[in-house]
Structures are given as structure tokens and as C-alpha cells.
Swiss-Prot record:
Organism: Photorhabdus laumondii subsp. laumondii (strain DSM 15139 / CIP 105565 / TT01)
Record-stated family: Belongs to the NAD(P)-dependent epimerase/dehydratase family. HldD subfamily.
Cofactors (names): NADP(+)
Keywords: Carbohydrate metabolism, Isomerase, NADP
Pfam families to which the protein is assigned, alphabetical: Epimerase
UniProt-annotated binding residues for substrate: 169, 180, 187, 201-204, 209, 274
UniProt enzyme class: isomerase
Statement: the UniProt record of this protein carries the keyword S-adenosyl-L-methionine: no
Binding site for NADP(+): 10-11, 31-32, 38, 53, 75-79, 92, 144, 170, 178
E.C. no: 5.1.3.20
Protein name per UniProt: ADP-L-glycero-D-manno-heptose-6-epimerase
């Protein structure tokens, strides 16, 4: 059996899809479906069982036996960069992850987990998986950073796989439940379908991020699991592209020459807490042996727009 926490969420459900595509169906999805809309992410996928997150944590703490577990992909977390309840964030992202890690270590079960590029904070270069380059801007980034630090202490003594992925700006299918935290491409597509011009923050041509297509992020997870590689790795494309490039790709897919991108004022509450530039350094990822290419914004957004608008 393979366990995917956060399996009804964005990246988690795409990992389930990638596993299905390779013939794996004996999958236990762990999630919190209080937001019932997330079920749609699983509706076309094959899983063996579902378990509520709170029940799962209780079972982990009790040391319950789940049988033969081939791997745990731990994607379950609060991923909101605008959530400032530190106790909630640390319970969800730090404490829960520690408990699950030790459960895996005791059983020598491969443990692959979601870290984040938010660990790097507001820097504009050297996005390298080393302590001197890390200084998160928000409590979400701090919760991910602290767990990475915890893993670093354990890795030298671990005799089973522990692998963390610092996701950069992930976008693509199955993110619709994320609301305001969904990708720019998702929101621009919605605006156009509502007969509006797509809107970007003023200065967006100067904001550059490393946008990675979710299918590529899932492929990284599966490759590392199959190859048994441990460590903490950036999961991005190694290319920074502008929000304007995302908007241009979305508009291009809609084939409507009347569309023009509007620029709106930058929100006050995000000033000083917003990464203006991200670009994954892939040196460590490539050195580990991962050599597959990553989609450009134009390629990934085109595939995503076809998926989003397939029923229209």
C-alpha cells in the first residue's frame, strides 16, 4: 500500500494520478474533507481507501499497523502563506510531520514530503538548499523550514529514505478548491470565462517566479521514491518567468483578440511579505540523477488551459 496525505488536495491528488498512470491503485488517501468540494480531485482516480486526517494522526500516535506500506507521500499541510495563526500552522505542518516521520523511521518506510520555496524568504538569488540561504517571510515558510532543519539532524542516522521537495510556484489541474491560493493561471482563466479582462498586480512584468507544472512536480516525487534517494531538493524548473508571461499564455489559449491585461494596485497587506523573484537552483536535483526536462510556462499553461476548459 502507498499512503498519500493531503491526497484530495492539489499536489497530493496529482501524485495519486501519477501513481495510477503507472498502475498503482492500492492507495490510502488521507485528507480533511470538511471542504467537500475537494472530492472532485479524486472522482476520476482509483484508490483503495480513504481516511480522515484526525483519525489517521490518532492511528499513527497509537502505532497502529497499516500493513505493508511501500511509501508515504506526505503532502497534507496548511499551505496558506497568508495564515498567521502560528499555533495552528505549527501543529499542522511541523508537529504532524514529525510524528509521521518517526512512524516511518521505526518501520523503515520511505517518507517523501512537501517542503516549500517559502523557506528562502525574500532573497532574489541563490535559491540553494543550504542553511545560509534560508530566512522565511511568513509563519508558513517557517513551519516548513523548521521541519527541514529537523530532517537535516536525522538524515545522517536514518536507515530508510527521507526526501523533501521545496516546491516553487506549482500550477495545474486539481487546484480549484484552493480559492485565493490557487495559481495566477487559474484566476486569469476564470476572469476571462466571466467575460472580464484578465487582471495582474501593477508591476507584474517585474515579478518573476519559477512556475512548475504540477505534473512535473508529481514526476519528481515518483522518480525519487523509485530511486531511493534521500535529502532535501528544490522542485522547480530552474527558470524564472514573469506573471506577464503567464497572462500572455492564458490569453493566447483563449484566442480572443479583444482581451487586454489590466493592471490593478498591489495589495497593502502583501507588501514586504511577497516574493518578487524565485528561481530554483537545480544543481543538487540534477546531481542526484534527475534529468527529465520541465515544461516552460507556455507549454504548461497551454496544457492546463485545455484541461480547465475541456467541457466548454
Amino acid at each position: 500500500m502507498i499512503i498519500v496525505t493531503g491526497g484530495a488536495g492539489f499536489i497530493g491528488s496529482n501524485i495519486v494520478k501519477a501513481l495510477n498512470d503507472e498502475g498503482y491503485k492500492d492507495i490510502l488517501v488521507v485528507d480533511n474533507l470538511k471542504d467537500g468540494t475537494k472530492f472532485i480531485n479524486l472522482a476520476d482516480l482509483d484508490i483503495a481507501d480513504y481516511m480522515d486526517k484526525e483519525e489517521f494522526i490518532a492511528s499513527i500516535l497509537a502505532g497502529d499497523d497499516f500493513g505493508d506500506i511501500d511509501a508515504i507521500f506526505h503532502e497534507g499541510a496548511c499551505s496558506s502563506t497568508t495564515e498567521w495563526d502560528g499555533k495552528y500552522m505549527m501543529d499542522n505542518n511541523y508537529q504532524y510531520s514529525k510524528e509521521l516521520l518517526h512512524y516511518c523511521l521505526e518501520r523503515r518506510t520511505p517518507f517523501l514530503y512537501a517542503s516549500s520555496a517559502a523557506t528562502y524568504g525574500g532573497r532574489t538569488d541563490n535559491f540553494i538548499e543550504e542553511r545560509q540561504y534560508e530566512k522565511p517571510l511568513n509563519v508558513y515558510g517557517y513551519s516548513k523550514f523548521l521541519f527541514d532543519q529537523y530532517v537535516r539532524e536525522i538524515l545522517p542516522q536514518a536507515d530508510s529514505q527521507i526526501c523533501g521537495f521545496r516546491y516553487f510556484n506549482v500550477y495545474g489541474p486539481r487546484e480549484g478548491h484552493k480559492g485565493s491560493m490557487a495559481s495566477v493561471a487559474f484566476h486569469l482563466n476564470n476572469q476571462i470565462n466571466q467575460r472580464q479582462n484578465p487582471k495582474l498586480f501593477a508591476g507584474s512584468e517585474g515579478f518573476q517566479r519559477d512556475f512548475i507544472y504540477v505534473g512535473d512536480a508529481a514526476a519528481v516525487n515518483l522518480w525519487f521514491w523509485k530511486n531511493g534517494v534521500s535529502g532535501i531538493y528544490n522542485c522547480g524548473t530552474g527558470r524564472a518567468e514573469s506573471f506577464q508571461a503567464v497572462a500572455d499564455a492564458v490569453v493566447e489559449c483563449h484566442k480572443d483578440k479583444s482581451l487586454t491585461v489590466e493592471h490593478i494596485d498591489f495589495p497593502e497587506h502583501l507588501k514586504g511579505r511577497y516574493q518578487r523573484f524565485t528561481q530554483a537552483d537545480l544543481t543538487k536535483l540534477r546531481a542526484a540523477g534527475y534529468d527529465k526536462p520541465f515544461k516552460t510556462v507556455a507549454e504548461g499553461v497551454t496544457e492546463y488551459m485545455h484541461w480547465l476548459n475541456q467541457d466548454k
